[in-house]
Amino acid sequence: MIEQGRSSQDLKWLENYFKEGGNKMAETYINELKSKLDARKKEILSQLNEEYNKILKSRFEDLESVKRNILKEVQNI
């Protein structure tokens, strides 16, 4: 609580002090949040890339199987 008898200049200084401190705290919070979101984004992209590679490999294996079957059929003709 602010004591009576403080000058308006002192009150203004105190107000600015808390305002600047609040901005720094907000910046720190935002930077920490951004860092966590960037890490999560990297993790999600890695998982998506891994899943994409699995699907791609599976499709390639399917195509190879079809190719082998067609070659067998052609040889039997």
Curated annotation (Swiss-Prot):
* Entries under InterPro entries matching the protein: ATPase_A1-cplx_e-su
Q: Which reaction does it catalyse?
A: ATP + H2O + 4 H(+)(in) = ADP + phosphate + 5 H(+)(out)
- Keywords assigned: ATP-binding, Hydrogen ion transport, Ion transport, Nucleotide-binding, Translocase, Transport
One MF annotation (Gene Ontology) recorded for this entry: ATPase-coupled transmembrane transporter activity
Identify the GO cellular component terms for this protein: proton-transporting two-sector ATPase complex, catalytic domain
EC number assigned by the record: 7.1.2.2
Top-level taxon in the UniProt lineage: Archaea
User: Might you name a Gene Ontology BP term for this protein?
Assistant: proton transmembrane transport
Family of this protein: To E.hirae NtpH.
Instruction: Relate the assembly described in the record.
Output: Sul-ATPase is composed of six (or maybe five) subunits: alpha, beta, delta, gamma, C (proteolipid), and possibly epsilon.
Q: What is this protein called?
A: Membrane-associated ATPase epsilon chain
Q: Which organism is it from?
A: Sulfolobus acidocaldarius (strain ATCC 33909 / DSM 639 / JCM 8929 / NBRC 15157 / NCIMB 11770)
* Source species taxonomy: Archaea, Thermoproteota, Thermoprotei, Sulfolobales, Sulfolobaceae
